[in-house]
Amino acid sequence: VSNQKQKVVVTGIGAITALGKSAEELWHAVLQGTHGIHQVESIVMDGYMASIAGEVKQPLEELQAAQAFKTNDRAISFALRAAEEALQTAGLQQLPEDSGCVIGTCLGGFKSWERWIEQKQAGEQGEGEAGLWRQVRFNGIAETVGSYVGIHGPVVTISTACAAGGNAIGHAADLIRSGKASVVLAGGADALSIVAVSGFHSLQSLSSEPCKPYSGDRDGLSLGEGAGILVLESEQHAAARGARIYAEVLEFGLSADGYHPTAPHPEGEGAARAIAMALNKSGVQPDAVDYINGHGTGTPKNDSAETMAIKRALGEDAANRTKVSSTKSMIGHLLGAAGAVEGIVTVLALHHQHIPPTANYTKPDPECDLDYTPNAAVQQNLTYAISNNFAFGGNNCCVVFQAYEPSASSKQEVEADSTDTTAASLQRERVVITGIAQISAAGTKISSLWDAIAVNDSNAANSLWTEALDANHNRTVVSKLTDYDSTQYISRKESRRMDTLGKLTVSVAMDALKDSELEVTEHNCNQVGVIFGTANGTMESLEQFYFPVLSEGAPAANPAHFPNTVFNQAAGQVAMHTGARGVSSTVVDGHASFSSALCMAYQHIQNKDAEAIVAIAADVLTPYVISGYKDSGLLLPYEAEGAVAPPVDQHGFVLGEGAVAVVVESLSHALARNATIYAEVSGYGRTFEASQVNAADSSFRKGSDYQAGLNSTGREEAGALTQSNRTAVAELATRSGLERAMLQALQGDCSEGEVESEDIVPDAIFIAQPAIDAAEPAEREAIEHVFADTPMLATCKHVIGEVQGAASGFQLLTALLSMQQGYLPQVHGSAVSLAEDVSLNHILVNGASLTGSYTSILLSKYE
């Protein structure tokens, strides 16, 4: 491993599974080969092909953290319990200001969503609805954990189905190496739900017996539930406080199959690339791998494909010498939490120098012919171990761990307070934007969006708004698609089993690649990635799949709809339709999801994981999505018959749907192919403000509540930026929320670039707030705390509304066009007018999740 990289170590672990309420109980049980797959008690399993699962038997009311936070969502409760234990084992009494949290989940708040839907369909209305809707949010688990433990740095939710937990660990390590955090809680959480049980039942994937991974008589998987959280730290931070270190996290690899919505590539091609990428980045030779914690689900196709992948990545000889085992044989498949809990088992295997077994193994299979450590643990000297996770949508993830050996210079570095090993001192790729695309109420062309924005009268833009019905058949003002035709991009045959979200995502990705003039070929396809962001994801498919099950039971579970219920399916469709099979991930960060996707893409480009990445965000409107926002009190009231232009003094916003995509590349790659460059991404900031997690119903309507996240109690000490006076990074602790995000973006990562971001004061800032009238008391004040001379404020939300997870993407697109055209849709109080002939060299684009997460991205004109 390069000695220039900051080491990332594991100092704390926490888990709650079918084998107990702690990581210690988990480890002792798996060493014995004990499984916890028994009759399910928390949900009714009548009519399904299996009635067993790896269910957590611990009553939720006994979980201290869940009680303290007043949540009744199982997944959130599991995550809180695991986080509590992880911090206890890490011995961390107080987290540093830049601490982060990255959580992987496949199901998010599905249990709460099921209850909320049942209430809606029964016509029940009460004060609990807003609380349930907040628990439905996929980013709710990470933000609740962040709030509970006191996180102020980046809070990220990854939803790459069954690969999410491993992806979360890898991304958390990247945040530490890049200097964005010194401590990160990383892991995953999921709870059993009728959606998951009926879905896997519809695919005929469940076994009626405890699953038998890799065994010749395997016939399906066993579902599970729980959570796993690891505390990751920079080695320097851990050494400085004398922390116990369990293991080191080396690197991780991501890839997309681009093959099929549910089935793995039969030869494990994509999975092999993820394994090879992780090993190559780690500097670990394939024959040095001592142990593989396998994906091992117990389904015939998955296990044989993984066996092929291991052989392809390691080579036949090395693969035959390496021990493999499946933790799922003992706890079931924890879906988005699988990689997290299995990562903990891998870490403990290295720490204790024991390889846990594959339980329930009865007979060999010619297609699974490796050493699967059947039924009994093995003591062995271990240096390197990997954890594999592969998922629906063709997402593949591999994380490499190493038995910890202190760096020879770690003590001296701590004593000298050295920062030479941080990523800021490394040579990194500059990142540029070379392609853009959008689909919205304004149309499907970039010119259509700009034409609507360029109207020099904010009232005229309301002509794009129309009406839609919520779940109670009440009319609502929305911004919806009108002239989008998916057959212009996708054949009718191909689109039959795709939902609207998938079609939108594929279409906008195709347009962005076309605009960038980047052709994806067999030669470069593994170097072109896809990072997808969404706030509400697959709600359309969830409704189509779950409603018949709710009324008719197991026989109504439709296998055509179930694959589209996972949030990463859209990114998988992009890989299949464009051939972009490089790094692939899906991030959920509320209305800042596009910004989070772009930040992640930026990191991968800088790490040289890809030459180009399509960063996308998309969301669609359904009656139940509209009702969810209404329950939270976020939307503009529908005032009058046919009213589609609400008065400016109303509080709330107009909800929209649409998609946005940008192609980001390394500067060297863009120059080599003579690409047109729209702008450079010079830096980004991601922060979290815990006070906003349970204030979604007021955070964008009342300055007093939003103030907690946007404004600082310590601004007098911090001071404001001027061209000649730069606030010290150490003073970020006196800031809050969006202020810290903007300052981090301006700090940048410009050691190798021409842009000296410490001297930058942006010419304009595209605001995060959906309601223009709220910019004065809230976001404007936060901006004034950072900048002595307030930059121009701008927005396009008066045109297309608040497009959920794509909201910050449309702001960024408009910022690029403004920089190109020299015109700016400038905010004046509660109105927007076009400022002409403006010089725009640097623009900040702010984003907010609505519930505590903030992003700020610095765009600089490329010259």
Regions found by a protein language model. Give the residues of each.
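Active-site-proximal alpha-helical scaffold in enzymes
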Residues: 79-91, 138, 142, 146-149, ...
